[in-house]
From Swiss-Prot:
Pathway: Nitrogen metabolism; nitric oxide reduction. GO terms for cellular component: cytoplasm. The gene is norW. It comes from Salmonella gallinarum (strain 287/91 / NCTC 13346). Its cofactor is FAD. It catalyses: 2 reduced [nitric oxide reductase rubredoxin domain] + NAD(+) + H(+) = 2 oxidized [nitric oxide reductase rubredoxin domain] + NADH. This is Nitric oxide reductase FlRd-NAD(+) reductase.
Length: 377
């Protein structure tokens, strides 16, 4: 008798995988185990909850019970997986255990909180649960410090500013989105945030946080300090690899998988923010959707290697939206930038004259798909 497929996790990757499996097989036993409620919500919406005046429960799209009924699943919410016995094909929690034929790790990634004095005062917004824990503080806060000027930090800074808050955005780098693109490309967003009233503290590092009568004092390495009501850590994500490590599965930055999404153990797979696919961690929606399509086939007996095309990454900054694609972080590209009142096109060219990356903003985003077709990958 088939012991079926167990998926650990209940986020976007897990749900996409369930839907793709059920398109091909209505009856294979499917079990999901996760530490949260398993209710569905749209995680990217967390970047806009404050300006939209949304509470955590407003984000719900589908309750866990409805999901289980729709896709014929066994669900175990609020359940921590303690261990995996890979040789025996057994998943263990504190008081239960489940046998499997195939196991999928969809454990996601955790928000990184800088290891400074007072780090417990920092808020994170990487899940509905985390937002629920701090929504009152964030709603009431007038002065907010965001640590980290990457994708999430920039999105949150714009959102909080639109909500009428006094926002300071801090980063070690000399420009925003520094790990994604050069300063001459990100400067348009940087200027726009400044014009909106966001105070930028670039080339700055946080040293400590202290609770005061007036709120929180944030002290920089430079000894400059500011008083705020809330501090948000937007300093990146770390793939959740502890469970894979305990199971004896190879990990690096993420859980190491090949083009078949298979780990170093033949019956254990990984998908989503926790997975490192052939050396790359790709925590974006499109690669996760494609991974789910291919992994569903492979779990049901197929042998289909994942092929990822050139893909768009969308920066959700509504007053100055950006799309980017290709190797935008490469330092050896020559950038051709056309900036006009209706938007910007920035093309990253190789020494051989090939288009290797691009960034488009505002009304010029409509040119993204044509550029995508000419991108060298």
């Amino acid at each position: 008798m088939s012991r079926g497929i167990i998926i650990i996790g209940s986020g976007f990757a897990a749900r996409q995988l369930v839907k793709n499996i059920r398109k091909q097989d209505a009856h294979v036993p499917l079990t999901l185990i996760a530490a949260d409620s398993m209710d569905e919500y749209n995680k990217p919406d967390l970047s806009h909850v404050i300006s939209q005046s949304q509470r955590a429960d407003d984000l719900n799209r589908q309750l866990a019970g409805e999901f289980a009924e729709q896709f014929n699943l066994r669900l175990f919410p609020h359940t921590w997986v303690a261990d995996i016995d890979a040789d025996a094909h057994v998943v263990k929690s504190q008081d239960k255990q489940w046998q499997y034929d195939k196991l999928v790790l969809a454990t996601g990634a955790a928000a990184f909180v800088p290891p400074i004095a007072g780090r417990e005062l920092m808020l994170t917004l990487n899940s509905q649960q985390e937002y629920r824990a701090c929504e009152t503080q964030l709603r009431d806060a007038q002065r907010v410090l965001i640590v980290g000027g990457g994708l999430i930090g920039s999105e949150l800074a714009m959102d909080l500013c639109r909500a009428g808050k006094t926002v300071t955005l801090m980063d070690n780098a000399a420009s925003l989105l520094a790990s994604l693109m050069p300063p001459e490309v990100s400067s348009r967003l940087q200027h726009h945030l400044t014009d909106m009233g966001v105070h930028l503290l670039l080339k700055s590092q946080l040293q400590k946080l202290e609770k005061t009568e007036a709120g929180i004092r944030a002290t920089l390495v430079s000894q400059h300090s500011i008083e705020v009501d809330a501090v948000i850590a937007a300093t990146g994500l770390r793939p959740e690899t502890a469970l894979a490590r305990r199971a004896g599965v190879a990990v690096n930055r993420g859980v190491c998988v090949d083009s078949y999404l298979q780990t170093s153990h033949p019956d254990i797979y990984a998908i989503g923010d926790c997975a490192e696919i052939n050396g790359q961690v790709l925590p974006f929606l499109q690669p996760i959707q494609l991974s789910a399509m291919y992994l569903a086939k492979n779990l049901l007996g197929g042998n289909a290697p994942l092929k990822l095309p050139a893909m768009l990454v969308k920066v959700k900054t509504p007053e100055l939206p950006l799309h980017l694609a290709g190797e935008t972080q490469r330092s050896d590209l020559s950038w051709q930038i056309t900036a006009e009142s209706d938007g910007m096109i920035a093309k990253g060219m190789s020494g051989e004259g090939q288009l290797r990356a691009f960034v488009v903003s505002e009304d010029r985003m409509k040119e993204a798909f044509a550029l995508l077709k000419t991108l060298s990958v």
